[in-house]
């Protein structure tokens, strides 16, 4: 999620991102409402979320508990600049390579599967951006305010669930040893 500061408040867009060192690259449809905002105020906040899961108060041994949500997220903030056309094409190649590897054993998609004219036409419909990350902050809520036995109990219940978010949070809770992740 990319957030810019519009004249009437925040403007939000969902976009695939690539982070390398302190640089975050992404692209948006040229028609996206965030594009003129970033042109006028070239600074953005990117929010990347990890696994998350609902925690039932019934899972605690202690009485008088409330429901909660455990999660992992990272925020990156900094100035953005519009990429040149050749840089945007490279970004698309890099994004495809990054995500296509997870689809193996299918052969990865590359722009070589498109006619150059069609690729160029589609490239003209997007705007690529590069953010220089000046601030990077992570937030975790993994029940670290609870005693170790309660954390273990909640992690065990989450691990029994079928959704990836619950299982991911359970693994992080077990790995953090009750301290959170920083």
Description of each model-found segment:
Residues 30-94:
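Short, structured beta-strand-loop surface elements
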Residues 1-30, 46:
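Short beta-strand segments
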Residues 81-182:
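C-terminal edge-of-domain segments
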């Amino acid at each position: 999620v990319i957030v810019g500061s519009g004249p009437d408040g925040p403007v939000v867009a969902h976009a695939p991102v690539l982070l390398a060192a302190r640089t975050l690259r992404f692209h948006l449809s040229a028609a996206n409402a965030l594009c003129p905002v970033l042109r006028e105020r070239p600074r953005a906040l990117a929010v990347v979320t990890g696994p998350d899961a609902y925690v039932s108060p019934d899972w605690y041994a202690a009485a008088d508990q409330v429901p909660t949500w455990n999660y992992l997220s990272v925020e990156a903030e900094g100035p953005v600049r519009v990429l040149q056309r050749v840089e945007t094409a490279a970004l698309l190649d890099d994004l495809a390579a990054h995500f296509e590897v997870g689809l193996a054993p299918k052969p990865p998609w590359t722009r070589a599967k498109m006619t150059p004219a069609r690729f160029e036409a589609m490239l003209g419909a997007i705007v690529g951006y590069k953010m220089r990350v000046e601030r990077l902050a992570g937030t975790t809520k993994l029940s670290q305010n609870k005693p170790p036995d309660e954390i273990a109990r909640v992690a065990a219940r989450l691990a029994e669930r079928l959704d990836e978010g619950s299982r991911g949070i359970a693994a992080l809770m077990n790995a953090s040893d009750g301290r959170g992740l920083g």
